[in-house]
Curated annotation (Swiss-Prot):
Listed CDD domains: RHOD_YbbB
Organism: Azotobacter vinelandii (strain DJ / ATCC BAA-1303)
Record's subunit section: Monomer.
Reactions mediated catalytically: 5-methylaminomethyl-2-thiouridine(34) in tRNA + selenophosphate + (2E)-geranyl diphosphate + H2O + H(+) = 5-methylaminomethyl-2-selenouridine(34) in tRNA + (2E)-thiogeraniol + phosphate + diphosphate; 5-methylaminomethyl-2-thiouridine(34) in tRNA + (2E)-geranyl diphosphate = 5-methylaminomethyl-S-(2E)-geranyl-thiouridine(34) in tRNA + diphosphate; 5-methylaminomethyl-S-(2E)-geranyl-thiouridine(34) in tRNA + selenophosphate + H(+) = 5-methylaminomethyl-2-(Se-phospho)selenouridine(34) in tRNA + (2E)-thiogeraniol; 5-methylaminomethyl-2-(Se-phospho)selenouridine(34) in tRNA + H2O = 5-methylaminomethyl-2-selenouridine(34) in tRNA + phosphate
Protein's name in the database: tRNA 2-selenouridine synthase
Length: 370
């Protein structure tokens, strides 16, 4: 029989399959990648046992739990756990603290299915704390450089091209702007933090000591950056990415119109997908009405509505350039120009995509200080 483990780095570095025996509501609040929720108790059962524990103590709560999970219900749950164990003989199971729930699942698997399956010592809480420490240690021990630039310069493309970059927007499933929502939901805050920490862990294990990040605000959509990382981003050196105005317009057209529409269509189908895409784009503009001002908003909204109607009629996406041009010139560019001025003393390099990539790769190799 394999022993229980507290080797948290190995679990995440090797993407070991794990069975989470917490209740669904706990799992939804935060979990790890490559984990399947096969709970010992449903949310309702867990609530009843918790109430019993508070009123009558541990022994009564355990007895109630055994009554609630018995007979056919118990058989089906053991079968699900056994199926997972057989499919993933290298895996582990865990509960919140690595205590009673995971021990019961272990015992039932052994007694009823003849399967010895190890658990993670300390459970979810210990693994979560390990990942939080991973991020904190990286911000204290590693070097970081930020990639900034005007909207549409392709900062995300630079991040994707570098092996030592942390894709904050990818982990948050959000493009990081007022128009950044995707067709699929953002992860829970804890899931976002866990994914980021695992990314850091794996890159550090591969020898990365200098990380590249996109210059983001504290919030990437609804996901909040870890405090230590955000504080560091107020002082990290900054590389400024440049591109032509025309190139930026075309990139925004691709990312926020063509690709976003395709995402919605893939999720919801052609008709419903386009309707959802149009509603999302329209709402994104409405979200910044106070910052745009009423007259400017009405003008851009009219241009957007005309472009969406043209697109829905099958006549292409060319008209979207009209509102994109207006939004860049009248809103985003002045805002970013102010931000660049406020961060000017931290800018260590500026250039186009190829020049920035070359500089950042030299930084990663230690050829220049970043």
């Amino acid at each position: 029989m394999r022993a229980d483990t507290a080797d948290y780095p190995q679990l995440f570095l090797e993407d070991v399959p794990m069975m989470d025996t917490r209740a669904p509501v706990e799992f939804a609040g935060g979990a790890f990648p490559n984990v399947l929720n096969l709970p010992l108790m449903t949310d309702s059962e867990r609530q009843k046992v918790g109430t019993c524990y508070k009123q009558h103590g541990q022994r009564a709560a355990i007895e109630l739990g055994h009554r609630l999970v018995s007979g056919r219900t118990k058989e089906l749950r053991i079968q699900a756990w056994a199926d997972f164990a057989r499919a993933h003989p290298e895996g582990y199971l865990y509960c919140f603290r690595g205590g009673l729930r995971s021990q019961i699942v272990q015992q039932w698997l052994r007694d009823e299915a003849g399967i010895d399956y190890p658990r993670v010592t300390g459970g979810y809480k210990a693994m979560r704390n390990f990942l939080l420490d991973t991020t904190r240690q990286a911000t204290a021990q590693c070097a970081f450089v930020l990639v900034g630039g005007l909207t549409g310069t392709g900062k995300t493309e630079v991040i994707a091209a570098l092996g030592n970059a942390l894709d904050l927007e990818g982990h948050a499933n959000h493009r990081g702007s007022s128009f950044g929502k995707r067709a699929t939901p953002q992860p829970a805050q804890i899931d976002f933090e866990n994914r980021l920490a695992i990314d850091i862990l794996r890159k550090r294990a591969a020898g990365v000591g200098r990380f590249v990040l996109e210059d983001e605000s504290r919030l990437v959509g609804s996901c909040s950056l870890p405090l230590e990382l955000h504080q560091g981003m107020q002082r990290y050196p900054l590389v400024w990415l440049e591109d032509s105005f025309e190139g930026r317009v075309e990139r925004i057209l691709r990312d926020y119109v063509v690709d976003l529409c395709a995402e919605f269509v893939a999720v919801e189908g052609p008709q419903a997908g386009f309707a959802a895409f149009a509603a999302r784009l329209t709402q994104s503009l409405a979200n910044i009405v106070k910052r745009l001002g009423g007259e400017r908003y009405q003008r851009l909204s009219t241009l957007m509505a005309r472009a969406l109607a043209e697109q829905e009629a099958g006549r292409g996406v060319a008209l979207h350039r009209d509102w994109i041009v207006g939004l860049l010139r009248e809103y985003y560019d002045p805002m970013y120009a102010y931000q660049r001025e406020s961060k000017a003393e931290r800018i260590v390099f500026s250039g186009d995509r190829e020049a920035v990539l070359a500089y950042l790769r030299e930084c990663a190799a230690g050829a220049v200080d970043g």
